[in-house]
From Swiss-Prot:
Organism lineage: Archaea, Methanobacteriati, Methanobacteriota, Methanomada group, Methanococci
Pfam families in UniProt: LAGLIDADG_2 (PF03161)
Matches recorded under InterPro entries: Homing_endonucl, LAGLIDADG_dom
Species in which this protein is naturally found: Methanocaldococcus jannaschii (strain ATCC 43067 / DSM 2661 / JAL-1 / JCM 10045 / NBRC 100440) (Methanococcus jannaschii)
Protein name: Uncharacterized protein MJ1098
GO molecular function, a single term: endonuclease activity
């Protein structure tokens, strides 16, 4: 209990899911053993002033996708299909010296009675993430910071979290889901990707959801070539165009 609550920084609800009981049971057990919210410490070894550019761009890439930062100062990512991407993220955070934890919960799907796995990666509470929350959630809602920096690895993390590749009759369509961001933020990302990589993403909307979409074959190929070194084995379908030799031959890449 102490390790889960104080060291790992898990909430009562997260601990309850992990051990298979109700939240109230965890609260009673915690209080019985004299473990209180004020005992949770914030690690101040890492701040925005002393981290490397590589770590900052890696985190920014995660936050463009599925990652979030809790009010408590943890970075959190959940996946319900595959976990090897989270294993990669865990490995990279450990290389940077951050404490990170990986859990698997059981949950019941909303659309059926099937019990499935939910994979959760969380860090310890850091002053760094408290600062990043102020930068990314100025009003409590995720907003893209003006000083956003994107590099190849960060682009790959964004694509792994919120990207897809679809084969169409005349080639491939690559999408980055951006419906959590405003139209102005979509334009900002569109311009950023054009400036950094020369990509001509279009802003599209389907129902209430926004996407950045890339259609030009050579640019789709270039994008996938950039992110391929960071793609885990079970996500290789996201760069499968690189091995579609009939498609490549059709526009004289090979």
């Amino acid at each position: 209990m102490y390790e889960k609550y104080i060291v790992e920084g898990l909430s009562d609800r997260e601990i309850a899911y992990l051990i298979g009981c109700g939240k109230a049971t965890v609260v009673r057990a915690r209080q019985k053993h004299g473990i209180y919210r004020e005992d949770v410490k914030m690690c101040d070894d890492y701040t925005l002033d002393n981290i490397s550019e590589d770590l900052r761009t890696f985190i920014d890439g995660l936050l463009l996708g599925d990652a979030c930062i809790t009010e408590k100062g943890n970075l959190l990512i959940t996946q319900n299909k595959r976990y090897d991407w989270l294993e990669y993220v865990k490995h990279r955070f450990q290389q940077f010296g951050l404490n990170v934890y990986f859990h698997c919960y059981k949950y019941k799907r909303r659309t059926s009675e099937v019990i499935a796995d939910l994979y959760v990666l969380s860090t310890s509470r850091y002053e760094l993430f408290r600062q990043l929350r102020e930068r990314w959630y100025p009003d409590g809602i995720k907003r893209i910071p003006n000083d956003l920096v994107i590099n190849d690895e960060g682009l790959a993390q964004w694509y792994l979290g919120d990207g897809s590749l679809t084969k169409q009759k005349n080639g491939y369509k690559l999408e980055l889901s951006t419906h959590g961001f405003t139209l102005d933020e979509n334009k900002f990302l569109q311009q950023k990707l054009k400036l950094l990589y020369g990509f001509d993403f279009r802003i599209s909307k389907k129902h209430q959801y926004r996407y950045l979409r890339l259609f030009k074959s050579k640019q789709v190929h270039a994008f996938c070539s950039i992110v391929e070194p960071f793609i885990p084995p079970s996500y290789r379908n996201k760069v499968r165009c690189l091995h579609d030799y009939q498609w490549l031959k059709s526009w004289d890449v090979i």
